[in-house]
Amino acid sequence: MWEQYASEIIGTIKWFRDLDYHVLVTALAKEETNDNGGTEYWPLLPMAKVQKQLPGIFDNVLAGVRRTEDAKDEQGRAVGVRVERFIVCDQYGGWHCKVRDPLRSLQAVERTGNIADLFRKMEGKQSNKITEKDTKA
């Protein structure tokens, strides 16, 4: 029964992947401890077997990561919160991501919160360096 369920879920995912236009699928991340005590992050899906197959099904599997820290002035006083956004594009820090980038223009972790920046870089329309200015909304 569970094998059939997994097969149907994978079939549905492949159906979405094979649509005749660009498809973006989003998922929450599932944190998992591996046999060595390290933390791994997988797309959150109903079955572990299906979770681990997802990166092999799609051309691009990315993870959006947000880091916040207290911002301080020169005297060390709190002046607000600083937010940084990153997109993980490869196996890094326990994240299971990948990008099919023929130009190999992307780093394992890109400092941006905008997926369109990554696609511009892969098309060769942008320099390899994404600056702070590029990430501001």
Regions found by a protein language model. Give the residues of each.
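Conserved H-loop
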Residues: 28
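Conserved GTP-binding G-domain of TRAFAC-class P-loop NTPases and closely related GTPase folds
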Residues: 15, 31-137
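Flexible beta-alpha connector loops of hexameric P-loop NTPases
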Residues: 1-5, 39
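Loop/turn-to-beta-strand initiation segments
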Residues: 19-25
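Phosphate-interacting basic helix/loop segments used at nucleotide- and nucleic-acid interfaces
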Residues: 5-12
